[in-house]
Protein backbone atom coordinates (compact mmCIF):
# COMPACT_ATOMS: atom_id res chain seq x y z
CA UNK A 1 0.00 0.00 0.00
CA UNK A 2 1.39 3.42 -0.98
CA UNK A 3 1.16 5.51 2.15
CA UNK A 4 1.90 8.70 0.18
CA UNK A 5 -1.58 8.68 -1.33
CA UNK A 6 -3.35 9.42 1.95
CA UNK A 7 -5.09 12.78 1.74
CA UNK A 8 -4.01 14.73 4.82
CA UNK A 9 -0.37 13.66 5.19
CA UNK A 10 2.31 16.41 5.48
CA UNK A 11 4.80 15.32 2.79
CA UNK A 12 8.39 16.36 2.08
CA UNK A 13 9.51 17.52 -1.37
CA UNK A 14 12.90 16.61 -2.72
CA UNK A 15 14.06 20.12 -2.02
CA UNK A 16 12.81 20.36 1.51
CA UNK A 17 13.56 16.77 2.38
CA UNK A 18 17.24 17.39 1.94
CA UNK A 19 16.97 20.31 4.29
CA UNK A 20 14.88 18.38 6.75
CA UNK A 21 12.00 20.84 6.49
CA UNK A 22 8.42 19.62 6.13
CA UNK A 23 6.00 21.21 3.75
CA UNK A 24 2.79 22.73 5.04
CA UNK A 25 0.02 20.25 5.49
CA UNK A 26 -2.05 20.08 2.31
CA UNK A 27 -5.78 20.12 2.79
CA UNK A 28 -7.49 17.52 0.57
CA UNK A 29 -11.22 17.34 1.01
CA UNK A 30 -12.69 13.92 1.72
CA UNK A 31 -15.31 12.52 -0.68
CA UNK A 32 -18.84 13.33 0.39
CA UNK A 33 -22.18 11.64 -0.20
CA UNK A 34 -23.40 14.67 -2.19
CA UNK A 35 -20.72 14.07 -4.85
CA UNK A 36 -22.82 11.19 -6.26
CA UNK A 37 -25.94 13.34 -6.85
CA UNK A 38 -26.85 14.47 -10.43
CA UNK A 39 -28.48 17.68 -9.17
CA UNK A 40 -27.16 20.31 -6.75
CA UNK A 41 -27.50 19.33 -3.13
CA UNK A 42 -30.07 21.98 -2.17
CA UNK A 43 -32.36 21.03 -5.09
CA UNK A 44 -32.18 17.32 -4.30
CA UNK A 45 -32.92 17.87 -0.63
CA UNK A 46 -35.80 20.21 -1.43
CA UNK A 47 -37.28 17.72 -3.88
CA UNK A 48 -37.31 14.83 -1.44
CA UNK A 49 -38.51 16.94 1.48
CA UNK A 50 -41.42 18.19 -0.65
CA UNK A 51 -42.20 14.65 -1.79
CA UNK A 52 -42.14 13.34 1.78
CA UNK A 53 -44.56 15.88 3.24
CA UNK A 54 -46.84 15.91 0.18
CA UNK A 55 -47.42 12.17 -0.02
CA UNK A 56 -47.68 11.96 3.78
CA UNK A 57 -50.49 14.52 3.74
CA UNK A 58 -52.19 12.78 0.78
CA UNK A 59 -52.13 9.37 2.48
CA UNK A 60 -53.44 10.71 5.76
CA UNK A 61 -56.36 12.40 3.99
CA UNK A 62 -57.17 9.25 1.99
CA UNK A 63 -57.04 6.98 5.03
CA UNK A 64 -59.28 9.31 6.98
CA UNK A 65 -61.86 9.23 4.16
CA UNK A 66 -61.73 5.43 4.10
CA UNK A 67 -62.36 5.27 7.82
CA UNK A 68 -65.36 7.60 7.51
CA UNK A 69 -66.79 5.64 4.56
CA UNK A 70 -66.05 2.22 6.10
CA UNK A 71 -63.71 1.27 3.24
CA UNK A 72 -61.05 -1.36 4.16
CA UNK A 73 -57.61 0.19 4.51
CA UNK A 74 -55.90 -2.62 2.57
CA UNK A 75 -57.83 -1.72 -0.58
CA UNK A 76 -55.60 0.80 -2.34
CA UNK A 77 -55.84 2.66 -5.62
CA UNK A 78 -53.04 3.26 -8.10
CA UNK A 79 -52.52 6.80 -6.84
CA UNK A 80 -52.26 5.57 -3.26
CA UNK A 81 -49.79 2.89 -4.31
CA UNK A 82 -47.60 5.46 -6.06
CA UNK A 83 -47.83 7.71 -3.01
CA UNK A 84 -46.64 4.92 -0.72
CA UNK A 85 -43.73 4.14 -3.04
CA UNK A 86 -42.79 7.83 -3.09
CA UNK A 87 -43.00 7.99 0.70
CA UNK A 88 -40.72 5.00 1.11
CA UNK A 89 -38.25 6.41 -1.43
CA UNK A 90 -38.11 9.79 0.27
CA UNK A 91 -37.63 8.22 3.70
CA UNK A 92 -34.82 6.02 2.39
CA UNK A 93 -33.13 9.01 0.76
CA UNK A 94 -33.38 11.30 3.79
CA UNK A 95 -32.26 8.69 6.28
CA UNK A 96 -29.57 7.30 4.01
CA UNK A 97 -28.20 10.65 2.89
CA UNK A 98 -27.97 12.30 6.28
CA UNK A 99 -26.97 9.02 7.92
CA UNK A 100 -24.06 8.62 5.51
CA UNK A 101 -22.89 12.16 6.21
CA UNK A 102 -23.15 11.63 9.94
CA UNK A 103 -21.22 8.35 9.90
CA UNK A 104 -18.70 9.69 7.40
CA UNK A 105 -17.80 12.54 9.75
CA UNK A 106 -16.69 9.99 12.32
CA UNK A 107 -14.90 7.84 9.73
CA UNK A 108 -12.92 10.78 8.37
CA UNK A 109 -12.12 11.92 11.89
CA UNK A 110 -10.91 8.43 12.76
CA UNK A 111 -8.72 8.33 9.64
CA UNK A 112 -7.22 11.70 10.55
CA UNK A 113 -6.53 10.60 14.09
CA UNK A 114 -4.93 7.35 12.97
CA UNK A 115 -2.77 9.31 10.52
CA UNK A 116 -1.45 11.51 13.32
CA UNK A 117 -0.17 8.48 15.19
CA UNK A 118 1.41 6.76 12.14
CA UNK A 119 4.69 5.01 12.94
CA UNK A 120 7.93 6.64 11.85
CA UNK A 121 8.98 3.83 9.51
CA UNK A 122 6.41 4.82 6.85
CA UNK A 123 7.42 8.48 7.13
CA UNK A 124 11.08 7.61 6.76
CA UNK A 125 10.26 5.54 3.67
CA UNK A 126 8.66 8.55 1.96
CA UNK A 127 11.67 10.75 2.73
CA UNK A 128 14.12 8.23 1.35
CA UNK A 129 12.14 7.79 -1.89
CA UNK A 130 11.70 11.54 -2.43
CA UNK A 131 15.35 12.26 -1.62
CA UNK A 132 16.47 10.07 -4.54
CA UNK A 133 14.98 12.67 -6.88
CA UNK A 134 16.70 15.63 -5.18
CA UNK A 135 20.28 16.95 -5.00
CA UNK A 136 21.34 13.87 -3.02
CA UNK A 137 19.69 11.29 -5.28
CA UNK A 138 22.83 9.14 -5.23
CA UNK A 139 23.21 9.36 -1.52
CA UNK A 140 24.07 5.71 -1.17
CA UNK A 141 26.89 5.82 -3.72
CA UNK A 142 28.31 9.32 -3.26
CA UNK A 143 28.14 9.38 0.54
CA UNK A 144 25.82 12.38 0.65
CA UNK A 145 24.13 12.50 4.02
CA UNK A 146 20.45 13.37 4.12
CA UNK A 147 19.47 14.99 7.41
CA UNK A 148 16.66 13.14 9.12
CA UNK A 149 13.34 14.95 9.35
CA UNK A 150 12.38 16.58 12.60
CA UNK A 151 10.47 14.26 14.83
CA UNK A 152 6.91 15.40 15.54
CA UNK A 153 5.97 15.17 19.17
CA UNK A 154 2.32 14.55 19.87
CA UNK A 155 1.18 15.70 23.28
CA UNK A 156 -0.88 13.01 25.02
CA UNK A 157 -4.51 13.91 25.62
CA UNK A 158 -4.60 12.27 29.03
CA UNK A 159 -1.78 11.53 31.48
CA UNK A 160 -0.52 8.03 31.06
CA UNK A 161 -0.98 5.74 34.02
CA UNK A 162 1.72 3.25 34.96
CA UNK A 163 0.94 -0.28 33.89
CA UNK A 164 -0.42 -2.47 36.64
CA UNK A 165 1.59 -5.64 37.21
CA UNK A 166 -0.14 -8.58 38.82
CA UNK A 167 1.59 -9.66 42.02
CA UNK A 168 1.48 -13.07 43.58
CA UNK A 169 -0.08 -13.53 46.98
CA UNK A 170 3.34 -13.80 48.61
CA UNK A 171 4.65 -10.58 47.07
CA UNK A 172 3.97 -7.20 48.65
CA UNK A 173 3.45 -4.10 46.53
CA UNK A 174 6.37 -1.74 46.72
CA UNK A 175 5.60 1.62 48.33
CA UNK A 176 4.92 4.46 45.93
CA UNK A 177 7.68 7.08 45.99
CA UNK A 178 6.20 10.51 45.45
CA UNK A 179 8.22 12.44 42.85
CA UNK A 180 7.68 15.79 44.60
CA UNK A 181 9.76 14.78 47.62
CA UNK A 182 13.18 16.42 47.95
CA UNK A 183 16.32 15.05 49.57
CA UNK A 184 15.43 16.82 52.81
CA UNK A 185 11.98 15.25 52.72
CA UNK A 186 13.54 11.84 52.17
CA UNK A 187 15.61 12.25 55.33
CA UNK A 188 12.52 13.23 57.31
CA UNK A 189 10.62 10.23 55.93
CA UNK A 190 13.38 7.90 57.04
CA UNK A 191 13.34 9.52 60.47
CA UNK A 192 9.58 8.98 60.78
CA UNK A 193 9.83 5.38 59.56
CA UNK A 194 12.59 4.65 62.08
CA UNK A 195 10.57 6.22 64.91
CA UNK A 196 12.98 9.05 65.57
CA UNK A 197 10.49 11.78 64.60
CA UNK A 198 6.88 11.54 65.83
CA UNK A 199 4.39 11.74 62.99
CA UNK A 200 2.14 14.10 64.93
CA UNK A 201 4.92 16.71 65.24
CA UNK A 202 5.53 17.23 61.51
CA UNK A 203 3.31 20.31 61.20
CA UNK A 204 5.00 22.11 64.09
CA UNK A 205 8.52 21.16 62.98
CA UNK A 206 8.11 21.93 59.27
CA UNK A 207 5.67 24.84 59.42
CA UNK A 208 4.10 23.59 56.19
CA UNK A 209 0.89 21.58 56.55
CA UNK A 210 0.87 20.35 52.95
CA UNK A 211 4.45 19.16 53.14
CA UNK A 212 3.79 17.48 56.49
CA UNK A 213 0.82 15.57 55.09
CA UNK A 214 2.84 14.48 52.05
CA UNK A 215 5.71 13.20 54.18
CA UNK A 216 3.34 11.46 56.60
CA UNK A 217 1.54 9.70 53.75
CA UNK A 218 4.76 8.43 52.20
CA UNK A 219 6.09 7.27 55.57
CA UNK A 220 2.83 5.42 56.23
CA UNK A 221 3.09 3.61 52.90
CA UNK A 222 6.62 2.49 53.68
CA UNK A 223 5.78 1.36 57.21
CA UNK A 224 2.68 -0.63 56.24
CA UNK A 225 3.75 -1.75 52.78
CA UNK A 226 0.29 -0.76 51.52
CA UNK A 227 -0.36 1.65 48.69
CA UNK A 228 -2.43 4.81 49.23
CA UNK A 229 -2.41 5.70 45.55
CA UNK A 230 -6.19 6.16 45.45
CA UNK A 231 -6.24 8.56 48.41
CA UNK A 232 -5.87 12.10 47.02
CA UNK A 233 -3.48 14.54 48.66
CA UNK A 234 -3.40 17.56 46.37
CA UNK A 235 -6.24 20.06 46.18
CA UNK A 236 -6.93 20.50 49.88
CA UNK A 237 -5.99 23.30 52.29
CA UNK A 238 -4.51 21.39 55.22
CA UNK A 239 -3.81 24.58 57.15
CA UNK A 240 -7.58 25.09 57.42
CA UNK A 241 -7.96 21.97 59.57
CA UNK A 242 -4.91 22.46 61.77
CA UNK A 243 -5.96 22.39 65.40
CA UNK A 244 -9.69 22.13 64.77
CA UNK A 245 -10.89 19.43 62.37
CA UNK A 246 -8.38 16.59 61.94
CA UNK A 247 -4.97 15.58 63.24
CA UNK A 248 -2.18 13.82 61.35
CA UNK A 249 -3.84 14.04 57.90
CA UNK A 250 -2.61 11.94 54.97
CA UNK A 251 -5.24 13.00 52.44
CA UNK A 252 -8.97 13.43 52.14
CA UNK A 253 -11.91 11.23 51.18
CA UNK A 254 -14.11 12.23 48.26
CA UNK A 255 -17.88 11.89 48.70
CA UNK A 256 -20.19 12.86 45.83
CA UNK A 257 -22.74 15.59 46.55
CA UNK A 258 -26.18 15.55 44.94
CA UNK A 259 -28.97 18.12 45.03
CA UNK A 260 -32.57 17.37 45.97
CA UNK A 261 -35.25 19.93 45.40
CA UNK A 262 -36.51 22.47 45.20
CA UNK A 263 -37.93 21.89 48.67
CA UNK A 264 -40.80 24.30 49.24
CA UNK A 265 -40.72 24.93 52.99
CA UNK A 266 -42.49 27.76 54.81
CA UNK A 267 -43.00 29.59 51.52
CA UNK A 268 -39.34 29.46 50.45
CA UNK A 269 -37.54 27.15 48.04
CA UNK A 270 -34.33 25.34 49.00
CA UNK A 271 -31.95 23.19 46.97
CA UNK A 272 -30.80 20.61 49.50
CA UNK A 273 -27.18 19.31 49.19
CA UNK A 274 -26.74 15.65 50.12
CA UNK A 275 -23.34 13.92 50.37
CA UNK A 276 -23.82 10.19 50.05
CA UNK A 277 -22.58 7.01 48.39
CA UNK A 278 -25.99 5.31 48.47
CA UNK A 279 -27.68 5.17 45.09
CA UNK A 280 -31.37 6.14 44.94
CA UNK A 281 -31.17 8.31 48.07
CA UNK A 282 -30.94 11.69 46.35
CA UNK A 283 -33.36 10.64 43.61
CA UNK A 284 -35.90 9.41 46.15
CA UNK A 285 -35.64 12.55 48.27
CA UNK A 286 -35.97 14.64 45.13
CA UNK A 287 -39.22 12.86 44.26
CA UNK A 288 -40.54 13.60 47.74
CA UNK A 289 -39.62 17.27 47.28
CA UNK A 290 -41.57 17.31 44.02
CA UNK A 291 -44.65 15.82 45.68
CA UNK A 292 -44.47 18.44 48.43
CA UNK A 293 -43.88 21.26 45.94
CA UNK A 294 -46.85 20.54 43.68
CA UNK A 295 -49.07 20.08 46.75
CA UNK A 296 -48.38 23.59 48.01
CA UNK A 297 -45.30 23.08 50.19
CA UNK A 298 -44.57 22.06 53.77
CA UNK A 299 -44.71 23.98 57.04
CA UNK A 300 -42.39 23.69 60.03
CA UNK A 301 -42.43 24.73 63.67
CA UNK A 302 -39.42 25.04 65.98
CA UNK A 303 -40.52 23.71 69.37
CA UNK A 304 -37.30 24.05 71.36
CA UNK A 305 -33.73 25.30 70.99
CA UNK A 306 -31.22 24.35 73.67
CA UNK A 307 -28.03 22.30 73.93
CA UNK A 308 -27.45 20.22 77.07
CA UNK A 309 -24.52 18.98 79.10
CA UNK A 310 -24.82 16.87 82.26
CA UNK A 311 -21.78 16.51 84.54
CA UNK A 312 -21.71 13.89 87.29
CA UNK A 313 -20.59 14.77 90.84
CA UNK A 314 -20.29 12.62 93.95
CA UNK A 315 -20.80 13.22 97.65
CA UNK A 316 -20.13 11.10 100.69
CA UNK A 317 -23.85 10.63 101.30
CA UNK A 318 -27.05 10.72 99.28
CA UNK A 319 -28.34 13.41 101.63
CA UNK A 320 -25.60 15.81 100.60
CA UNK A 321 -26.29 15.05 96.93
CA UNK A 322 -29.97 15.87 97.48
CA UNK A 323 -29.06 19.16 99.15
CA UNK A 324 -27.16 20.27 96.06
CA UNK A 325 -30.07 19.16 93.88
CA UNK A 326 -32.48 21.37 95.81
CA UNK A 327 -30.01 24.26 95.68
CA UNK A 328 -29.44 24.30 91.91
CA UNK A 329 -33.13 23.74 91.11
CA UNK A 330 -34.27 26.58 93.39
CA UNK A 331 -35.46 29.50 91.19
CA UNK A 332 -33.93 31.93 93.69
CA UNK A 333 -30.44 30.66 92.84
CA UNK A 334 -30.91 30.56 89.07
CA UNK A 335 -29.75 34.15 88.48
CA UNK A 336 -26.48 33.55 90.32
CA UNK A 337 -25.81 30.34 88.43
CA UNK A 338 -26.69 32.07 85.15
CA UNK A 339 -24.11 34.78 85.75
CA UNK A 340 -21.46 32.13 86.30
CA UNK A 341 -22.53 30.15 83.25
CA UNK A 342 -22.89 33.05 80.80
CA UNK A 343 -19.60 34.81 81.52
CA UNK A 344 -17.59 32.57 79.19
CA UNK A 345 -19.52 33.43 76.01
CA UNK A 346 -21.54 36.28 74.57
CA UNK A 347 -23.94 33.81 72.93
CA UNK A 348 -24.36 31.12 75.59
CA UNK A 349 -27.38 31.78 77.81
CA UNK A 350 -28.44 29.35 80.51
CA UNK A 351 -32.05 28.23 80.09
CA UNK A 352 -32.60 25.72 82.86
CA UNK A 353 -31.14 23.09 85.20
CA UNK A 354 -32.53 19.63 85.99
CA UNK A 355 -31.00 17.02 88.28
CA UNK A 356 -31.20 13.25 88.70
CA UNK A 357 -29.85 11.28 91.68
CA UNK A 358 -28.38 7.78 91.63
CA UNK A 359 -27.45 7.05 95.26
CA UNK A 360 -24.85 9.58 96.34
CA UNK A 361 -24.14 10.57 92.73
CA UNK A 362 -25.81 13.61 91.22
CA UNK A 363 -26.29 14.27 87.50
CA UNK A 364 -26.87 17.97 86.74
CA UNK A 365 -28.29 18.75 83.29
CA UNK A 366 -27.59 22.28 82.05
CA UNK A 367 -29.55 23.55 79.04
CA UNK A 368 -28.55 26.70 77.17
CA UNK A 369 -28.94 28.54 73.88
CA UNK A 370 -25.81 28.63 71.74
CA UNK A 371 -26.46 31.08 68.90
CA UNK A 372 -25.58 29.74 65.46
CA UNK A 373 -23.07 27.23 66.83
CA UNK A 374 -23.95 23.63 67.57
CA UNK A 375 -22.68 24.56 71.02
CA UNK A 376 -21.01 21.58 72.69
CA UNK A 377 -17.82 23.49 73.50
CA UNK A 378 -19.79 26.55 74.50
CA UNK A 379 -21.99 24.72 76.99
CA UNK A 380 -19.03 22.75 78.36
CA UNK A 381 -17.18 25.97 79.24
CA UNK A 382 -20.25 27.35 80.96
CA UNK A 383 -20.72 24.13 82.94
CA UNK A 384 -17.10 24.25 84.07
CA UNK A 385 -17.63 27.79 85.40
CA UNK A 386 -20.67 26.68 87.42
CA UNK A 387 -18.86 23.62 88.79
CA UNK A 388 -15.98 25.80 89.98
CA UNK A 389 -18.47 28.03 91.79
CA UNK A 390 -20.38 25.11 93.35
CA UNK A 391 -17.18 23.49 94.55
CA UNK A 392 -16.42 26.59 96.58
CA UNK A 393 -19.89 26.33 98.16
CA UNK A 394 -19.76 22.53 98.58
CA UNK A 395 -16.15 21.61 99.32
CA UNK A 396 -17.05 17.93 99.76
CA UNK A 397 -18.35 17.73 96.18
CA UNK A 398 -16.17 15.54 93.97
CA UNK A 399 -16.45 16.25 90.23
CA UNK A 400 -16.21 12.86 88.53
CA UNK A 401 -16.64 14.06 84.96
CA UNK A 402 -17.90 17.06 83.05
CA UNK A 403 -20.05 14.65 81.03
CA UNK A 404 -21.93 11.93 82.86
CA UNK A 405 -23.83 10.59 79.79
CA UNK A 406 -27.13 11.92 81.11
CA UNK A 407 -26.99 14.52 78.29
CA UNK A 408 -26.86 12.20 76.26
CA UNK A 409 -24.47 12.94 73.38
CA UNK A 410 -24.04 10.68 70.33
CA UNK A 411 -26.00 7.83 71.89
CA UNK A 412 -29.67 6.86 71.61
CA UNK A 413 -31.35 7.85 74.87
CA UNK A 414 -34.90 8.26 76.09
CA UNK A 415 -34.04 11.59 77.72
CA UNK A 416 -33.37 13.16 74.32
CA UNK A 417 -36.43 11.48 72.79
CA UNK A 418 -38.64 12.93 75.53
CA UNK A 419 -36.97 16.21 76.55
CA UNK A 420 -35.21 17.04 73.32
CA UNK A 421 -31.67 18.24 72.65
CA UNK A 422 -30.51 20.88 70.22
CA UNK A 423 -33.42 21.90 68.01
CA UNK A 424 -36.83 20.22 68.31
CA UNK A 425 -38.77 20.54 65.05
CA UNK A 426 -42.06 19.31 63.63
CA UNK A 427 -42.67 19.51 59.87
CA UNK A 428 -45.92 18.70 58.05
CA UNK A 429 -47.54 18.76 54.62
CA UNK A 430 -50.81 17.79 52.97
CA UNK A 431 -50.25 15.80 49.77
CA UNK A 432 -53.13 15.92 47.34
CA UNK A 433 -54.75 12.74 46.09
CA UNK A 434 -53.75 13.24 42.45
CA UNK A 435 -50.14 13.87 43.50
CA UNK A 436 -50.09 10.64 45.50
CA UNK A 437 -51.28 8.76 42.43
CA UNK A 438 -49.27 10.49 39.69
CA UNK A 439 -46.00 11.39 41.43
CA UNK A 440 -45.77 8.80 44.21
CA UNK A 441 -47.51 6.02 42.25
CA UNK A 442 -49.56 4.73 45.18
CA UNK A 443 -52.79 5.30 47.13
CA UNK A 444 -53.51 7.35 50.25
CA UNK A 445 -55.10 4.42 52.10
CA UNK A 446 -52.13 2.16 51.30
CA UNK A 447 -49.67 4.72 52.69
CA UNK A 448 -51.63 5.19 55.90
CA UNK A 449 -51.85 1.44 56.48
CA UNK A 450 -48.17 0.87 55.73
CA UNK A 451 -47.09 3.66 58.07
CA UNK A 452 -49.16 2.19 60.89
CA UNK A 453 -47.85 -1.35 60.48
CA UNK A 454 -44.23 -0.45 59.64
CA UNK A 455 -43.20 2.79 61.33
CA UNK A 456 -45.39 2.48 64.42
CA UNK A 457 -46.30 -1.15 65.15
CA UNK A 458 -43.18 -2.66 63.60
CA UNK A 459 -40.84 -0.28 65.41
CA UNK A 460 -42.66 -0.90 68.70
CA UNK A 461 -42.31 -4.65 68.23
CA UNK A 462 -38.58 -4.13 67.70
CA UNK A 463 -38.28 -2.02 70.85
CA UNK A 464 -37.11 0.99 68.86
CA UNK A 465 -36.02 4.13 70.68
CA UNK A 466 -36.74 7.17 68.53
CA UNK A 467 -36.81 5.02 65.42
CA UNK A 468 -40.46 5.29 64.43
CA UNK A 469 -39.61 6.20 60.84
CA UNK A 470 -38.56 4.64 57.55
CA UNK A 471 -35.05 6.06 57.03
CA UNK A 472 -34.66 9.48 58.64
CA UNK A 473 -30.98 8.81 59.36
CA UNK A 474 -30.27 8.48 55.62
CA UNK A 475 -31.28 12.05 54.93
CA UNK A 476 -29.82 13.45 58.16
CA UNK A 477 -26.42 11.86 57.52
CA UNK A 478 -26.28 13.05 53.90
CA UNK A 479 -27.17 16.65 54.78
CA UNK A 480 -24.81 16.61 57.78
CA UNK A 481 -21.84 15.48 55.67
CA UNK A 482 -22.56 18.08 53.01
CA UNK A 483 -22.92 20.98 55.45
CA UNK A 484 -20.06 20.20 57.85
CA UNK A 485 -22.05 18.94 60.83
CA UNK A 486 -20.78 16.32 63.27
CA UNK A 487 -21.75 13.04 61.56
CA UNK A 488 -21.67 11.15 64.87
CA UNK A 489 -24.57 13.26 66.11
CA UNK A 490 -26.71 11.60 63.48
CA UNK A 491 -27.53 9.11 66.26
CA UNK A 492 -29.84 11.37 68.25
CA UNK A 493 -30.53 13.83 65.42
CA UNK A 494 -32.27 11.03 63.50
CA UNK A 495 -34.79 10.42 66.28
CA UNK A 496 -38.04 10.83 64.38
CA UNK A 497 -41.64 9.71 64.40
CA UNK A 498 -43.42 9.75 61.06
CA UNK A 499 -47.21 10.14 61.08
CA UNK A 500 -49.60 9.69 58.14
CA UNK A 501 -53.34 10.28 58.14
CA UNK A 502 -56.05 10.53 55.49
CA UNK A 503 -57.78 13.93 55.49
CA UNK A 504 -60.40 15.78 53.45
CA UNK A 505 -62.83 12.85 53.43
CA UNK A 506 -60.01 10.39 52.93
CA UNK A 507 -58.85 11.89 49.64
CA UNK A 508 -55.64 13.66 50.68
CA UNK A 509 -52.70 12.62 52.84
CA UNK A 510 -51.46 14.49 55.91
CA UNK A 511 -47.85 13.53 56.65
CA UNK A 512 -45.59 14.85 59.40
CA UNK A 513 -42.23 14.20 61.01
CA UNK A 514 -41.43 15.14 64.61
CA UNK A 515 -37.71 15.33 65.40
CA UNK A 516 -36.91 16.35 69.00
CA UNK A 517 -33.11 16.48 68.88
CA UNK A 518 -31.63 17.95 65.70
CA UNK A 519 -28.10 19.11 66.56
CA UNK A 520 -26.77 21.52 63.95
CA UNK A 521 -24.72 24.69 63.65
CA UNK A 522 -23.59 27.08 60.93
CA UNK A 523 -20.32 28.16 62.56
CA UNK A 524 -17.44 26.16 63.99
CA UNK A 525 -16.22 22.65 63.28
CA UNK A 526 -16.50 21.42 59.71
CA UNK A 527 -18.72 24.31 58.62
CA UNK A 528 -15.65 26.45 57.90
CA UNK A 529 -14.26 24.03 55.28
CA UNK A 530 -14.56 25.30 51.72
CA UNK A 531 -16.85 22.58 50.34
CA UNK A 532 -19.14 22.50 53.36
CA UNK A 533 -19.25 26.27 53.52
CA UNK A 534 -20.37 26.34 49.88
CA UNK A 535 -23.25 23.97 50.66
CA UNK A 536 -24.32 26.15 53.60
CA UNK A 537 -24.20 29.16 51.31
CA UNK A 538 -26.45 27.32 48.84
CA UNK A 539 -29.05 27.02 51.60
CA UNK A 540 -28.60 30.65 52.64
CA UNK A 541 -27.37 29.81 56.15
CA UNK A 542 -23.61 30.30 55.85
CA UNK A 543 -21.94 31.60 59.00
CA UNK A 544 -23.53 33.50 61.86
CA UNK A 545 -26.53 35.76 61.51
CA UNK A 546 -25.45 39.07 63.04
CA UNK A 547 -28.92 40.59 63.06
CA UNK A 548 -30.62 37.62 64.74
CA UNK A 549 -28.05 35.31 66.37
CA UNK A 550 -29.10 31.69 66.15
CA UNK A 551 -31.57 32.11 63.29
CA UNK A 552 -29.30 30.46 60.70
CA UNK A 553 -28.87 27.33 62.80
CA UNK A 554 -32.60 27.18 63.50
CA UNK A 555 -33.37 27.52 59.79
CA UNK A 556 -30.92 24.73 58.98
CA UNK A 557 -32.70 22.48 61.48
CA UNK A 558 -36.05 23.08 59.79
CA UNK A 559 -34.50 22.35 56.38
CA UNK A 560 -33.18 19.05 57.74
CA UNK A 561 -36.66 18.18 58.99
CA UNK A 562 -38.24 19.17 55.67
CA UNK A 563 -35.75 17.00 53.79
CA UNK A 564 -36.54 14.08 56.09
CA UNK A 565 -40.24 14.61 55.37
CA UNK A 566 -39.54 14.35 51.63
CA UNK A 567 -37.40 11.25 52.06
CA UNK A 568 -39.97 9.52 54.26
CA UNK A 569 -42.77 10.27 51.84
CA UNK A 570 -40.91 8.89 48.82
CA UNK A 571 -39.54 5.72 50.45
CA UNK A 572 -42.88 4.80 52.00
CA UNK A 573 -44.51 5.26 48.60
CA UNK A 574 -41.91 3.05 46.93
CA UNK A 575 -42.50 0.30 49.49
CA UNK A 576 -46.26 0.66 49.17
CA UNK A 577 -46.10 0.41 45.38
CA UNK A 578 -43.61 -2.47 45.44
CA UNK A 579 -40.89 -0.44 43.68
CA UNK A 580 -38.14 -0.54 46.32
CA UNK A 581 -36.22 -3.59 45.10
CA UNK A 582 -36.55 -2.59 41.44
CA UNK A 583 -35.20 0.91 42.01
CA UNK A 584 -32.27 -0.29 44.12
CA UNK A 585 -31.34 -2.92 41.57
CA UNK A 586 -31.23 -0.13 38.97
CA UNK A 587 -29.45 2.64 40.88
CA UNK A 588 -27.75 1.10 43.91
CA UNK A 589 -25.76 -1.87 42.61
CA UNK A 590 -21.99 -1.95 42.43
CA UNK A 591 -20.67 -3.13 39.06
CA UNK A 592 -16.96 -2.63 39.76
CA UNK A 593 -14.83 -5.35 41.32
CA UNK A 594 -12.46 -3.44 43.60
CA UNK A 595 -10.55 -6.63 44.46
CA UNK A 596 -8.92 -6.62 41.03
Curated annotation (Swiss-Prot):
GO BP field: coenzyme A metabolic process; isoprenoid biosynthetic process; sterol biosynthetic process
For the region Catalytic, what residue ranges are annotated?
184-596
Q: What subcellular locations does the record give?
A: Endoplasmic reticulum membrane
What pathway is this protein a component of?
A: Metabolic intermediate biosynthesis; (R)-mevalonate biosynthesis; (R)-mevalonate from acetyl-CoA: step 3/3
InterPro entries per the UniProt record, alphabetical: HMG_CoA_Rdtase, HMG_CoA_Rdtase_cat_sf, HMG_CoA_Rdtase_CS, HMG_CoA_Rdtase_eu_arc, HMG_CoA_Rdtase_N, HMG_CoA_Rdtase_NAD(P)-bd_sf, HMG_CoA_Rdtase_sub-bd_dom_sf
Q: Look up and give the membrane topology term.
A: Multi-pass membrane protein
Keywords, sorted A to Z: Endoplasmic reticulum, Glycoprotein, Isoprene biosynthesis, Membrane, NADP, Oxidoreductase, Transmembrane, Transmembrane helix
Q: Which residues are glycosylated?
A: 342, 455, 588
Question: What class does this enzyme belong to in the EC scheme?
Answer: oxidoreductase
Q: Which residues form the active site?
A: 278, 410, 486, 584
What is the induction note for this entry? Induced by wounding. This enhancement is greatly reduced by treatment with arachidonic acid or after inoculation with the fungal pathogen, P.infestans.
Any single Gene Ontology cellular-component annotation: peroxisomal membrane
One family from Pfam that matches here is HMG-CoA_red
Task: Please give the positions of the paired cysteines in each disulfide bond.
Answer: none
**EC code(s) of this entry:** 1.1.1.34
Q: Which GO terms describe its molecular function?
A: hydroxymethylglutaryl-CoA reductase (NADPH) activity
Tissue-wise, where is it found?
Expressed in flower primordia and anthers.
Where is region (Linker) located?
104-183
Chain segments carrying region Disordered: 1-29
User: Which reaction is the catalytic activity of this chain?
Assistant: (R)-mevalonate + 2 NADP(+) + CoA = (3S)-3-hydroxy-3-methylglutaryl-CoA + 2 NADPH + 2 H(+)
Bilayer-crossing residues are 41-61, 83-103
PANTHER family listed in its UniProt record: 3-HYDROXY-3-METHYLGLUTARYL-COENZYME A REDUCTASE (PTHR10572), 3-HYDROXY-3-METHYLGLUTARYL-COENZYME A REDUCTASE 1 (PTHR10572:SF56)
Q: Which family does it belong to?
A: Belongs to the HMG-CoA reductase family.
Outline what the protein does.
Catalyzes the synthesis of mevalonate. The specific precursor of all isoprenoid compounds present in plants.
Q: What is this protein called?
A: 3-hydroxy-3-methylglutaryl-coenzyme A reductase 1
Organism expressing this protein natively? Solanum tuberosum
Name the encoding gene, please.
Answer: HMG1
Amino acid sequence: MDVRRRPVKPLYTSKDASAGEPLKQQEVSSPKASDALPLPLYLTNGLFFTMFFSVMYFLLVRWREKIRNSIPLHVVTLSELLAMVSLIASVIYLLGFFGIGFVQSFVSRSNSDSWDIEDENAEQLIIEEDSRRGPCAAATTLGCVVPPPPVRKIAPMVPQQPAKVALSQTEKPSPIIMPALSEDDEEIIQSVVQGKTPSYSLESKLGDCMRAASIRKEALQRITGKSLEGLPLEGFDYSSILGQCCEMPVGYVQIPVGIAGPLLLDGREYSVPMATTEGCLVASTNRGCKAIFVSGGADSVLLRDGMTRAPVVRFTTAKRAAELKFFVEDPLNFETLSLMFNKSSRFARLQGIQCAIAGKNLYITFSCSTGDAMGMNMVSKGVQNVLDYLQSEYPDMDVIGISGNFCSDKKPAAVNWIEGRGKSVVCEAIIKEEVVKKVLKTEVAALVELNMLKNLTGSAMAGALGGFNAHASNIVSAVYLATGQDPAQNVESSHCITMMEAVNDGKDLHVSVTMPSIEVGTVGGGTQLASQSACLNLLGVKGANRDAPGSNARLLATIVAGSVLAGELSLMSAISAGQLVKSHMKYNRSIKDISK
